[in-house]
């Protein structure tokens, strides 16, 4: 009986708080609350702003290099493993892949911001 009373009280209190949370904001409707705010930009303007493709390519390149660096982070703990040759081979492979990727991006001028 005590458990049933506790569950009923908690459920009633939770439902009461939910109803108050939905009902209370509708009492005071202001123009500022009903209009969208987009960080100081005019929300009623054009939604199709020009997007820099160079910025997109630099951002994707950053994400790829960041992922490769994240793969290198556990290497100090991998040194403590039993198979040191495998760990060193994988580390050398990841570092050479990172260097080759950077060299390719550099030769293709993917990191150049100004044209």
Curated annotation (Swiss-Prot):
GO terms for biological process: mitochondrial electron transport, NADH to ubiquinone. InterPro entries: NADH_UbQ/plastoQ_OxRdtase_su3 (IPR000440), NDAH_ubi_oxred_su3_sf (IPR038430). Its EC number is 7.1.1.2. This is NADH-ubiquinone oxidoreductase chain 3. PANTHER family: NADH-UBIQUINONE OXIDOREDUCTASE CHAIN 3. The keyword Cell inner membrane does not apply. GO terms for molecular function: NADH dehydrogenase (ubiquinone) activity. It is an enzyme of class 7 (translocase). GO terms for cellular component: mitochondrial inner membrane; NADH dehydrogenase complex. Gene3D superfamilies: NADH:ubiquinone/plastoquinone oxidoreductase, chain 3. It catalyses: a ubiquinone + NADH + 5 H(+)(in) = a ubiquinol + NAD(+) + 4 H(+)(out). It is found in: Mitochondrion inner membrane. Belongs to the complex I subunit 3 family. Core subunit of the mitochondrial membrane respiratory chain NADH dehydrogenase (Complex I) which catalyzes electron transfer from NADH through the respiratory chain, using ubiquinone as an electron acceptor. Essential for the catalytic activity of complex I.
């Amino acid at each position: 009986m005590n458990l049933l009373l506790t569950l009923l009280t908690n459920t009633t209190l939770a439902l009461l708080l939910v109803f108050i949370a939905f009902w209370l904001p509708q009492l005071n409707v202001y123009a500022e609350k009903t209009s969208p705010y987009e960080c100081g930009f005019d929300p009623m303007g054009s939604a199709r702003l020009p997007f820099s493709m160079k910025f997109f390519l630099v951002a994707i390149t950053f994400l790829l290099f960041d992922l490769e660096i994240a793969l290198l982070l556990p290497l100090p703990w991998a040194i403590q493993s039993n198979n040191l040759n495998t760990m060193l081979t994988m580390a050398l492979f990841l570092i050479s892949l990172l260097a080759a990727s950077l060299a390719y991006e550099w030769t293709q001028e993917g990191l150049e911001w100004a044209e």
